[in-house]
Amino acid sequence: MTKLPKVDVVGVGLNATDTLIPVPHYPALGSKVEFHSANVLPGGQVASAVVACQQWGLRTRYVGKVGDDPAASIHRAEFDRLGVEAHLITAPGCASQQAFILVDDAGERTVLWKRDHRLTLRPEELQREWITDSRALHVDGHDTAAAVAAADWARAAGIPVIADLDELYPGIEALLPNLDYLITSRDIPGRLVGEQDLRKSLPALRNRYGCRLTAATLGQEGVLAWDGAQFQYTPAFRVETTDTTGAGDIFHAGFILWTPARMAACTSA
């Protein structure tokens, strides 16, 4: 077997084929709204973060599952164009995950999505070297069993694990103890520990699962993190917004740039 080159980050998680539909405003119930255009683009939570890391100069690998439809070809072509080492497992007779995304004139998006259960990535479809020949692992936890297996291998190899968690998927409790950097949406810490105050729930989350850092993204308010010694709050940049689709994914890519794995990559380059 040919040994894989070491990459700076490997992502295991969702991809999706997004149809972006700009509209002047979100439709009221029972109304009709003319849309400006409809653009089909590859996206997805982990896939987008990996692509951003690649475009910012990191060496990247992506592992995920697609159908056997034209959308899968779009993803393969885009990963290849950008230089991402992609391992795309095909689900026969199945459509790739798709999303229809309404984006209003203020840039806020509303996502309608569909994912066939046959797109679930299974642990036995992973190869250990995809994970261990890297300096960092990024997961979203959607296909929980596969994420747990990948995180186990990463931890055993001393590789930091970063998670983008926006929902409490079944079995997620098995993943949480194997995370170094847990970054969630605003509501997740409270749902996990039963405390809505982030200045209490983030430390409780870190203590319970042993993460190096816990953080919650706050949309236009920024992000709040707890590293075990102090809180770190960073406000969001104030920009003229065109489209918020993928904003969180890009934030996670930015965070990956500053993990210890990134520091090691910088010093060894």
Regions found by a protein language model. Name each.
Residues M1-D8, E34, L198-A269:
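Conserved phosphate-binding/catalytic region of the ribokinase-like
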Residues H87-A91, I101-G141:
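Conserved phosphate-binding/catalytic loop of the ribokinase/pfkB sugar-kinase fold
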Residues M1-K65, A72-I74, E240-T242:
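Glycine-rich phosphate/adenosyl-contacting loop at the front of the ribokinase-like
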Residues E78-G93:
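A glycine-rich helix N-cap at a beta->alpha junction
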Residues A151-Y233, E240:
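Conserved phosphate/ATP/ADP-binding segment of small-molecule kinases
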